[in-house]
Amino acid sequence: LPLTSFGREKNAFRDYLLRDGRTVSFRYEGQEYSITIRKVSLFPQGYAAVLTQSILLDEPSVIVADIGGWTVDLMRLDNRIPNASTCRSLELGMIRCLDEIGEQIRRALGLSMTATQMESVLRGDAVHINEDARKIIDRQADAYVHRLLSAITESGLDTRAMPAVFLGGGAALLKRNVSAADGLCRPVI
């Protein structure tokens, strides 16, 4: 389940999947099946990503930050258990970052770059991009990362005090812009 709705929707979603013990019938690859779901385990998005990081398994608290298109969803795990009361959603997704980058490039250079071009630069893939535009993209991405880290801290999750796992498409794009030099305890992307 999405981080911010995990605590609120967990029981309803479990009930939906269990279907009051009723049999569920379906066809798969031409074969008929009838099953009864007896047990359901639910976890927040990104939970498996934390558990696969052996360096984090003994950490008492870990921040999970899922950077999506429109929002950044946050949750803290305490002793590997999701703490639903710490869920937050920040309206700082990658679309806002890319819009700001595009606006700065238009103002400074009069160029109209696509989101795909900007994403390519953020990943370190683009080769045929105006060098001044590349510098603006890098500078704006750094500014976005600092704004994001500040917002995470303001929401009560201090990235300087506990490790943070960054997930989602936005995390992949910003991988080159986040490091321990940003004051992070231990970033995992």
Where are these predicted regions, by residue range?
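Nucleotide/phosphate-binding catalytic cleft detector across ATP-hydrolyzing
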Residues: 1-62, 81-96, 116-189
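Active-site-proximal alpha-helical scaffolds that flank and shape metal-associated catalytic sites
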Residues: 65-69
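Short beta-strand scaffold segments in enzyme catalytic cores
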Residues: 72-76
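Conserved AAA+ ATPase "sensor/coupling" helix adjacent to the nucleotide-binding pocket
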Residues: 104-108
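Short, basic interhelical loop/turn and adjoining N-cap
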Residues: 109-113
